[in-house]
């Protein structure tokens, strides 16, 4: 239902290029609910756990270096089909394949600098959320706009 959650992170290049507010704005305007957010320099061990499935890829060392090159904004968003819809809002992993109107389609050019991460499934969202956030950092609250967003 509308309690599904996803993990969204603005990567170091997105932070440096000042698109954090734009990302938050788009998720808010869509009607999703912000559940958690933190600004941090991600430790290498956290990034290695986050990207463990890519550890055998040739680009892996560059990916870890890029993701630890500056601070990131880690967020949890909640709402109906938020994982799938969030991925559509982000655009394709490769910005060259992303349509205008998507975050990557509007703000980036190259796959190695694709400014944002979004969970690719409900399962990976659960894993990523528990990796980046403690349970008590996920805020439970009633958002009064929800009645105007869902039937």
Swiss-Prot record:
Binding annotation for ATP: 11, 59, 87, 93, 104, 114
Q: Its catalytic activity?
A: a 2'-deoxyribonucleoside 5'-diphosphate + ATP = a 2'-deoxyribonucleoside 5'-triphosphate + ADP; a ribonucleoside 5'-diphosphate + ATP = a ribonucleoside 5'-triphosphate + ADP
Q: Which cofactor does it need?
A: Mg(2+)
Keyword terms: ATP-binding, Kinase, Magnesium, Metal-binding, Nucleotide metabolism, Nucleotide-binding, Phosphoprotein, Transferase
Keyword hit for Cell membrane? no
Molecular-function GO term, any one: metal ion binding
Q: How does it assemble?
A: Homohexamer.
InterPro entries, sorted: NDK-like_dom (IPR034907), NDK-like_dom_sf (IPR036850), Nucleoside_diP_kinase (IPR001564), Nucleoside_diP_kinase_AS (IPR023005)
The domain of life for this entry's organism is Eukaryota
Look up the EC number in the record and give it: 2.7.4.6
Q: Which organism is it from?
A: Ginglymostoma cirratum
The protein's job, in short, is:
Major role in the synthesis of nucleoside triphosphates other than ATP. The ATP gamma phosphate is transferred to the NDP beta phosphate via a ping-pong mechanism, using a phosphorylated active-site intermediate.
- The record's top EC class is transferase
Instruction: State the similarity comment.
Output: Belongs to the NDK family.
Active-site residue numbers: 117
Q: Which GO terms describe its biological process?
A: CTP biosynthetic process; GTP biosynthetic process; UTP biosynthetic process
Q: Would you tell me the protein name for this molecule? A: Nucleoside diphosphate kinase
